[in-house]
């Protein structure tokens, strides 16, 4: 019998945690559910379990995984352990697109929820502008990319504030609630489409893990080792933007997942993307789903949005990381 390698054991461990979260967290909430009532589909426990708890747990798992994997990609491309989708303004662009859709009352575009299309469009426009601003002699400067991303985030945030001041009270409440970032219940049709996008994108990215190991060292060196640097970079930005925009469209902007999880996983298991990517995906999902479970339990019957819980945990962690960097 073949023994599992240490790297395989890490992936298995995170996979078990992901599965356990999917099974246990739907039962965590402001009031308990009777397991026997759920098993026999008795109301109201069955409806609460299926329509509320399971859907938001699954959304938390896959949204957290998507944000964490996107953060891992951007950190590899920029060779900066603190890079996130927020760093490049992609999350802000997706947020602006979604807010515009809410403001204008768009429902569907070509049969697809308008907020999805608008978020993806906003992310794509910001990415194109940021990369274009940082492009010099067909090479992208990481420093210029970061500065362009910060500028784009500021501009998008300003436009969001302008729109917020123009909309009606009802829409302003919807926008402010959405901007907090949460994994409130979503219908299964939207959830199914989101999960499909995330799983397919994650599978494509993880198949390129070996090439990302080379890219994380140095793109020039990676090209001498046979990596198609330009193609890989474009696919990385595209995949990271798609994961971010798809998540923001359903959950609103949720910060720190794409920073905290890849950084923690990398410090514990190393920088081999063949292990880092799946573990970061699984770990990010567990973290965000757990934050949602905490938020709906600690001040019951009220709730704290998952984005707020994540910020409470992630903010001090970022300060600690920056302090460790300055000391070293």
Regions from the language model: what does each represent?
Residues 1-328:
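Alpha-helical transmembrane segments in inner-membrane proteins
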């Amino acid at each position: 019998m073949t023994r599992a390698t240490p790297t395989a054991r890490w992936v298995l461990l995170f996979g078990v945690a992901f599965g356990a979260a999917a099974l246990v967290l739907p039962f965590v909430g402001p009031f308990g559910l009777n397991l026997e009532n759920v098993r026999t589909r008795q109301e109201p426990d069955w409806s609460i379990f299926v329509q509320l708890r399971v859907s938001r747990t699954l959304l938390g798992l896959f949204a957290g995984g998507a944000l964490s994997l996107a953060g891992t990609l951007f950190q590899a491309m920029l060779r900066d352990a603190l890079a996130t989708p927020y760093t490049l303004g992609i999350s802000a662009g997706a947020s602006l697109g979604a807010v515009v859709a809410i403001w204008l009352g768009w429902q569907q575009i070509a049969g697809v929820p308008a907020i999805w299309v608008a978020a993806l469009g906003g992310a794509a426009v910001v990415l194109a502008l940021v990369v274009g601003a940082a492009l010099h002699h067909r090479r992208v400067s990481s420093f210029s990319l970061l500065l362009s991303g910060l500028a784009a985030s500021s501009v998008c945030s300003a436009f969001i504030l302008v729109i917020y001041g123009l909309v009606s009270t009802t829409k302003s409440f919807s926008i402010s609630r959405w901007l907090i970032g949460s994994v409130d219940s979503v219908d299964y049709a939207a959830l199914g489409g989101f999960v499909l996008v995330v799983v397919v994108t994650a599978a494509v990215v993880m198949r390129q893990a070996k090439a990302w190991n080379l890219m994380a060292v140095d793109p020039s060196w990676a090209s001498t080792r046979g990596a198609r640097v330009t193609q890989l970079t474009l696919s990385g930005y595209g995949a990271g933007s798609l994961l971010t925009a798809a998540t923001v469209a359903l959950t609103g902007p949720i910060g720190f997942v794409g920073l905290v999880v890849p950084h923690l996983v990398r410090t514990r298991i190393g920088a081999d993307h063949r292990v880092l990517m799946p573990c970061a995906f699984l770990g990010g999902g567990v973290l965000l789903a757990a934050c949602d479970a905490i938020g709906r339990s600690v001040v019951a019957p009220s709730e704290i949005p998952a984005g707020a819980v994540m910020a409470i945990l992630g903010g001090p962690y970022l300060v600690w990381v920056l302090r460790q960097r300055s000391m070293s």
